[in-house]
Amino acid sequence: MLQKGGFMGKTVVKKQEQQAELQPKFVRVCGTVTDMMCGRRTYKNGRKDKEDKFRLSIKPADGEIEKLIDEAAPYYENADANYIPKFLKDDASDDDLEYLNLKSSFEFPFAKLENGAIVEAGIFTNVLEQYGNITGSKVVVTVKLVEGAFYPASVCIVELKSKSLTDFYSDLEFDKLPFA
């Protein structure tokens, strides 16, 4: 952009540099799945989700959350305090740094590591249908950073630990369930 006099002004250059810096960025975070669900949620304050959300919670491996904090901080410099993730806040507790909670309105793709090769496992609901609850599975989550937000872009299951209802209950407890 040329301004009067035929030179590029400092403010224009600064804006272009900021825009170049805040292009979407992808960061990989390794960890263990602690929860995976889809649907609408009702919060403590009574607010409800308007649409189905796809949620994935992981416990990041050592040093992974710090790596994400370093990469994500510039994307939240001008964000409203209500929209800043807990792990990025100055007063973040150890509990806030222990888990990474991801949610999306769109299903994100999964892949699975099999015999040293990455194989497509489908989208979120396919994984739930095929493998059930994958709590305890080792994963690598690719997080997409954009200005003021972060989203799960994809998940690669490195070590699958699939669970069924019988894994949560003993045989005696399972027989007492109303649908058994």
Explain the meaning of each model-derived region.
Residues L2-F108:
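OB-fold ssDNA-binding interfaces and closely related basic DNA-contact patches used
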Residues S57-K59, T142-K144, C156:
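Residue-level recognition of well-ordered beta-strand positions that form the cores
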Residues K10, D171-A180:
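Short acidic DE-rich linear segments
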Residues I118-V139, L145-A149:
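Exposed beta-sheet edge/beta-hairpin loop segments within beta-rich domains
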Residues A73, N115-G116, Y151-C156:
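"Short basic amphipathic alpha-helical interaction patches in structured regions
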Residues L102-L128:
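Beta-strand/loop nucleic-acid-binding surfaces
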Residues V146-D167:
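OB-fold/S1-family single-stranded nucleic acid-binding modules
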Residues K53-R55, K138-V140, P152:
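Broad gene-expression machinery/nucleic-acid interaction feature
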